[in-house]
Amino acid sequence: ETRMSALDLTALRVIAAKHIDSAASRGAKEILTRQGVVITPLAADAIQRRGLTTRQVDGPAAPCPASKTSQANPKAPAASAAAQALFRSPEAERIKAEIVTTGKKLWHRQFVDGNGGNISYRIGPNEVLCTPTLCSKYDLTPELICMVDLEGNQIAGSAARTSEIFLHLQIYKTVPEAKGVVHCHPPHATAYAIAGRVPPSGIVPEFDVFVGAVALTPYETPGTQRFAETVIPYVKNYNTVLLGNHGIVCWADTVTHAEWYAEVL
């Protein structure tokens, strides 16, 4: 097996976790990139966890920026007793069950594929329950649900939280009345997002009555803070937003009601 000190990924425009895992398995200590490359959140976690560095071929070596995925960081502090109590409270168990049910509905309706889509609920002033990363919504169980704070730090749960949690947290910060958020990829709605258009009104009465107008964001790399910030201009006035070239996100007073918006759209 060939061992190396550096792995050349300058041909890639997007570096994913699988590339980092492959590099580490081959003994690489450094990742070579080009300016403007996108490093996904999971890849950033893997770089930090494995102690690798990244270096642009036309610049000096630099450590990868720290990710906010606390679950992937072995130095993350243990959950506080208060967080654990909230995470295992009767209210939390009820919401976990609702999230699981909603996830399976999304899967059966073909609104998600693979491990796509994510769901969250704001259970406290600074606490949010959410689905885990790399998990099919068909396979969701209450034991897989995580809890994070409003900065994205994981404070409870054994599975790592979704890499797109910042989208959810941005909505909770921007719209205080939001309690449940659902992000998914319904094929027809996603087609509108790819085409850069919003569905017309006056065609289906249920859409006009229950959803109304929807907004469309510009594209940014999913999982990044810039991606999360694309919804800021819209979510105060729209419960349902098309995410450019990606999918949709809906918020409501409950997870179930947020999923209803996705269904009607």
Regions found by a protein language model. Name each.
Residues 65-265:
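Glycine-rich flexible loops
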Residues 1-97, 101:
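Intrinsic disorder
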